[in-house]
Amino acid sequence: MHVISDECVKCGACASTCPTGAIEEGETKYVVTDSCIDCGACEAVCPTGAISAE
């Protein structure tokens, strides 16, 4: 998973949904760390579609 910085509005929905705590707040966007298990929960809750598995 990765965050598309142009789309991310830093709402925090992804970070609060992540079951492994793999999403951390960065300076301009949220960052997906190595503890991501690719479950897709963050992608499903992102209101702007800023998270992609590609």
From Swiss-Prot:
Residues 2-28, 29-54 form the 4Fe-4S ferredoxin-type domain. InterPro entries: 4Fe4S_Fe-S-bd, 4Fe4S_Fe_S_CS, 7Fe_ferredoxin, PSI_iron-sulfur_center. Binds 2 [4Fe-4S] clusters. [4Fe-4S] cluster 1 binds at C8, C11, C14, C46. Its cofactor is [4Fe-4S] cluster. Coiled coil: none annotated. GO terms for molecular function: 4 iron, 4 sulfur cluster binding; electron transfer activity; metal ion binding. PROSITE patterns: 4FE4S_FER_1 (PS00198), 4FE4S_FER_2 (PS51379). [4Fe-4S] cluster 2 binds at C18, C36, C39, C42. One of its GO terms (cellular component) is cytoplasm. Keywords: 4Fe-4S, Electron transport, Iron, Iron-sulfur, Metal-binding, Repeat, Transport. It comes from the Bacteria. Ferredoxins are iron-sulfur proteins that transfer electrons in a wide variety of metabolic reactions. This is Ferredoxin. It comes from Megasphaera elsdenii. The lineage of its organism: Bacteria, Bacillati, Bacillota, Negativicutes, Veillonellales.
